[in-house]
A protein has these predicted regions:
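Conserved mixed alpha/beta catalytic, RNA-binding, or beta-rich assembly cores of soluble enzyme
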Residues: 109, 118-125, 137, 156, ...
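Auxiliary Fe-S-binding modules of radical SAM enzymes
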Residues: 3-7, 12-17, 21-29, 33, ...
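N-terminal pre-triad scaffold of radical SAM enzymes
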Residues: 77-121, 155-156, 163-166
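Acidic (Asp/Glu)-rich catalytic clusters
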Residues: 152-156, 212-216, 259-261
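Conserved strand-turn element in the central/C-terminal portion of the radical SAM core barrel
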Residues: 195, 199, 203, 239-240, ...
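Core AdoMet radical
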Residues: 120-148, 152-177, 191-206, 218-251, ...
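Catalytic cores of alpha/beta
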Residues: 206-213, 274-290
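Alpha-helix-loop-beta-strand connector modules within alpha/beta enzyme cores
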Residues: 178-193, 245-263, 316-333
Length: 432
């Protein structure tokens, strides 16, 4: 993938020429059931190829039989930072969050329409070879991961990672194996050196699981609501795509996280551009703020192989407005009731004096990746997910502080250009 390639996805307007993705547009395909021999990791289990250390996803060879808790998958950014695979990222020397993903031959048993890990892909490719948030996820022995980070701390006094996050999936073993993976980690690395987050799977969890994870050192507990409304949730994560998740259970788990972890120690993921209005998205943000939590935003991008890979990415105008609104609500005390919206639910006024708003926009902070904080500041995410929701050619969530041409581009997208300043297409890459 080229750093400056658009990858064929338009992000200024959708096919209807609008700067928002409406429900009429964002309809996933119906899932097709794989043949019986390919279900539940049948290809991997029948061939039973033994794993040998690090496995880099390769759809041209037989995938080894790798299983958590002995094995986990890492984001490409984490693997690069650990030195487990070659390469570099545009304007990023490393990622500050070590994202771990549980792995099984059967894969995730959910069928979320926008996700590259969804169950319907069994016929397409084996679980460990599937793309997720636009990148490959190499598989590595969990002990090896923990030993590398422990060695960094011992020899250098520090590690690039501010935080480690275990991403659970929908699988009968994922609850118990999460405890084992976490124990392997804390046996090597103290939570005082690297903070711990859990990206949970509410469908299989009970309240005692949340308590146990906290007792084991977890700092922040997050829930992937993903959809901004119950209707979109059901269409993309529930019965609409033959998937087991329900809005009710996810919201219940978020409330339990509030009670167990406390203020600002829980959060929810929200994907923008799946058919919700900006008002609906920011109303959900407000509910979470009122609970004492934070929202972690993702910009919808059509994941290759998913049931929504034929749909348009979120128009940047829509994304920037929600991104800015979310930051104002989370960190500047603005409430959704202070904002004004048009008849299509688009933000028309952010509820803040123009001079103050301009100063805040100029910091670039609202447009950086949102997630669990690291060691720099509460409003700077350790989980920077480099280019997980956009190509580099049209960055949605900045894994670095946007300045210069990047800020001019953002201001153009917000229709907030400064007098005498303008953005020229592609100028942010002039010095590459």
């Amino acid at each position: 993938m080229s750093c400056v390639k658009t990858e064929g996805v338009q992000t200024d307007k959708n096919p209807m020429g609008m700067d928002i993705n409406t429900p009429e547009i964002m309809q996933p395909r119906a899932p097709v059931k794989p043949s019986k021999e390919l279900r539940n990791g049948g290809r991997v289990k029948s061939n039973a190829v033994a794993p040998t250390g690090v496995y880099l996803p390769n759809n041209n060879i037989q995938t080894p039989n790798m299983t958590s808790p002995e094995y986990v998958q890492l984001s490409t950014a984490a693997a690069l930072t650990l030195g487990l695979m070659p390469g570099s990222m545009y304007n990023c020397s490393c990622t500050r969050c070590l994202n771990l993903l549980l792995t099984y031959p059967e894969g995730c048993r959910a069928n979320c329409a926008y996700c590259g890990l969804a169950r319907h892909r069994e016929a397409d490719r084996d679980y460990a070879d599937r793309n997720f948030i636009r990148v490959d996820w190499p598989a590595v022995p969990m002990t090896q991961v923990a030993e590398i980070v422990a060695k960094q701390i011992k020899e250098d006094g520090d590690t690039p990672f501010h935080r480690m996050c275990i991403s659970m999936i929908t699988h009968p073993r994922s609850d118990e194996d999460t405890f084992t993976v976490l124990k392997t980690w804390t046996d090597h690395v103290s939570p005082d050196d690297v903070m711990i987050s859990i990206l949970s799977n509410p469908t299989t969890m009970v309240r005692d699981d949340l308590v146990k994870l906290k007792d084991m050192g977890t700092d922040i507990f997050t829930v992937s609501m993903d959809a901004a409304t119950p209707e979109i949730f059901d269409r993309t994560r529930g019965k609409g795509v033959q998937s087991p998740h329900t809005w009710k259970k996810y919201w219940q788990t978020l409330e339990e996280a509030r009670d167990i972890y406390g203020k600002e120690k829980f959060g929810a993921h929200i994907i923008i551009g799946m058919g919700e209005t900006e008002y609906e998205a920011l109303s959900l943000v407000q509910k979470i703020v009122d609970m004492g939590g934070h929202s972690h935003m993702f910009c919808f991008f059509p994941e290759q192989g998913s049931l929504m890979d034929h749909l348009p990415a979120t128009p940047r105008d829509q994304w920037r407005r929600v991104q800015l609104g979310r930051y104002l609500m989370d960190y500047a005390g603005v409430r959704v009731e202070q904002m004004k919206f048009d008849e299509l639910g688009r933000v028309k006024d952010f509820g803040m004096p123009k001079a103050e708003l301009d100063m805040l926009v100029d910091t670039g902070l609202p447009f950086q990746t949102s997630g669990c904080p690291g060691k720099f500041a509460e409003d700077i995410s350790a989980c920077d997910r480099p280019y997980g929701d956009s190509p580099v050619s049209d960055i949605a969530s900045y894994p670095f502080k946007p300045e210069g041409a990047h800020m001019r581009k953002i201001r153009q997208q917000l229709d907030m250009e400064k007098p005498g300043e303008s953005y020229e297409q592609g100028e942010e890459f002039d010095d590459l």
